[in-house]
Amino acid sequence: MVAKQRIRMANEKHSKNITQRGNVAKTSRNAPGEKASVGPWLLALFIFVVCGSAIFQIIQSIRMGM
């Protein structure tokens, strides 16, 4: 009897899963009114370091290549 009940519960859970297909729950993204988790200065520093190191690497490869 317990096995039949367990199978019935699994079938109900599965059928709920099928009928709700395509209904995606809301994401955990910030609402439009909330602030970003990274400040503008930290973002600017990160971009400066990444772009600066890329430019430095390009200049160094040009010097060594010629």
UniProtKB/Swiss-Prot annotation:
Signal peptide: none annotated. The chain crosses the membrane at residues 39-59. Interacts with SEC61B, SEC61A1 and the SEC61 complex. Interacts with CANX. Residues 60-66 are extracellular. This is Stress-associated endoplasmic reticulum protein 1. One of its GO terms (cellular component) is cytoplasmic microtubule. Residues 1-38 are cytoplasmic. Residues 17-30 have a biased composition (Polar residues). Belongs to the RAMP4 family. One of its GO terms (biological process) is endoplasmic reticulum unfolded protein response. PANTHER family: STRESS ASSOCIATED ENDOPLASMIC RETICULUM PROTEIN SERP1/RAMP4, STRESS-ASSOCIATED ENDOPLASMIC RETICULUM PROTEIN 1. It is found in: Membrane; Endoplasmic reticulum membrane.
